[in-house]
Amino acid sequence: MTITLDELRRDIDRVDEVLVRLLNERARCVCEVGRLKKALGVDIYQPDREKEVLKHVRDVAHEGPLGPEAIGRLFERIIDEARRLERRVVHGEMDGDLKPESLKPEI
Protein backbone atom coordinates (compact mmCIF):
# COMPACT_ATOMS: atom_id res chain seq x y z
CA MET A 1 0.00 0.00 0.00
CA THR A 2 1.25 3.46 -0.89
CA ILE A 3 0.91 6.24 1.63
CA THR A 4 -0.85 9.34 0.32
CA LEU A 5 0.12 12.97 0.61
CA ASP A 6 -2.89 13.60 2.85
CA GLU A 7 -1.83 10.78 5.19
CA LEU A 8 1.68 12.17 5.42
CA ARG A 9 0.30 15.64 6.14
CA ARG A 10 -1.90 14.23 8.91
CA ASP A 11 1.19 12.60 10.39
CA ILE A 12 2.99 15.94 10.27
CA ASP A 13 0.00 17.65 11.91
CA ARG A 14 0.07 15.12 14.75
CA VAL A 15 3.79 15.63 15.26
CA ASP A 16 3.28 19.41 15.20
CA GLU A 17 0.66 19.10 17.94
CA VAL A 18 3.10 17.15 20.09
CA LEU A 19 5.82 19.74 19.42
CA VAL A 20 3.49 22.57 20.48
CA ARG A 21 2.61 20.77 23.72
CA LEU A 22 6.29 20.14 24.45
CA LEU A 23 7.28 23.72 23.63
CA ASN A 24 4.59 24.99 25.99
CA GLU A 25 5.79 22.60 28.68
CA ARG A 26 9.31 23.95 28.17
CA ALA A 27 7.95 27.51 28.32
CA ARG A 28 6.28 26.80 31.67
CA CYS A 29 9.63 25.56 32.99
CA VAL A 30 11.30 28.68 31.61
CA CYS A 31 8.79 30.88 33.43
CA GLU A 32 9.58 29.10 36.69
CA VAL A 33 13.28 29.62 36.00
CA GLY A 34 12.52 33.32 35.46
CA ARG A 35 10.72 33.53 38.80
CA LEU A 36 13.62 31.87 40.56
CA LYS A 37 16.18 34.09 38.83
CA LYS A 38 14.18 37.14 39.92
CA ALA A 39 14.05 35.90 43.53
CA LEU A 40 17.78 35.16 43.52
CA GLY A 41 18.75 38.35 41.69
CA VAL A 42 20.36 36.36 38.88
CA ASP A 43 20.71 37.79 35.36
CA ILE A 44 18.35 36.45 32.71
CA TYR A 45 21.10 36.10 30.13
CA GLN A 46 23.32 33.14 31.00
CA PRO A 47 25.66 32.66 28.01
CA ASP A 48 27.40 29.60 29.47
CA ARG A 49 24.05 27.85 30.00
CA GLU A 50 22.93 28.72 26.48
CA LYS A 51 26.15 27.28 25.04
CA GLU A 52 25.60 24.14 27.13
CA VAL A 53 22.02 23.73 25.83
CA LEU A 54 23.08 24.29 22.22
CA LYS A 55 25.94 21.81 22.52
CA HIS A 56 23.61 19.22 24.03
CA VAL A 57 20.94 19.50 21.33
CA ARG A 58 23.54 19.50 18.57
CA ASP A 59 25.09 16.37 20.05
CA VAL A 60 21.78 14.49 20.01
CA ALA A 61 20.90 15.82 16.54
CA HIS A 62 22.90 13.04 14.90
CA GLU A 63 19.94 10.71 15.55
CA GLY A 64 17.77 12.10 12.72
CA PRO A 65 17.66 13.77 9.32
CA LEU A 66 18.07 17.29 10.74
CA GLY A 67 21.74 17.81 11.34
CA PRO A 68 23.41 19.60 14.23
CA GLU A 69 23.48 22.98 12.49
CA ALA A 70 19.76 22.92 11.67
CA ILE A 71 18.86 21.83 15.19
CA GLY A 72 21.17 24.51 16.57
CA ARG A 73 19.38 27.20 14.55
CA LEU A 74 15.98 26.00 15.75
CA PHE A 75 17.11 26.01 19.37
CA GLU A 76 18.68 29.44 19.05
CA ARG A 77 15.18 30.71 18.25
CA ILE A 78 13.65 28.68 21.10
CA ILE A 79 16.22 30.17 23.48
CA ASP A 80 15.44 33.69 22.20
CA GLU A 81 11.77 33.12 23.06
CA ALA A 82 12.74 31.67 26.43
CA ARG A 83 14.70 34.83 27.26
CA ARG A 84 11.71 36.93 26.21
CA LEU A 85 9.45 34.95 28.55
CA GLU A 86 11.93 35.25 31.41
CA ARG A 87 12.10 39.04 30.91
CA ARG A 88 8.31 39.24 31.08
CA VAL A 89 8.28 37.21 34.29
CA VAL A 90 11.03 39.29 35.87
CA HIS A 91 9.27 42.54 34.96
CA GLY A 92 5.93 41.27 36.29
CA GLU A 93 4.21 41.32 32.90
CA MET A 94 2.74 37.81 33.18
CA ASP A 95 -0.05 36.55 35.39
CA GLY A 96 0.23 33.29 37.25
CA ASP A 97 -1.69 30.98 34.95
CA LEU A 98 0.79 31.16 32.05
CA LYS A 99 -2.00 30.67 29.51
CA PRO A 100 -1.68 32.15 26.03
CA GLU A 101 -4.03 35.02 26.96
CA SER A 102 -1.41 36.22 29.42
CA LEU A 103 1.29 36.24 26.76
CA LYS A 104 0.50 39.54 25.06
CA PRO A 105 2.88 40.39 22.21
CA GLU A 106 5.61 42.87 22.92
CA ILE A 107 5.34 46.15 21.03
Locations of the language-model features?
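Domain-level signature for soluble enzymes in the chorismate/prephenate branch of the shikimate pathway
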Residues: 1-107
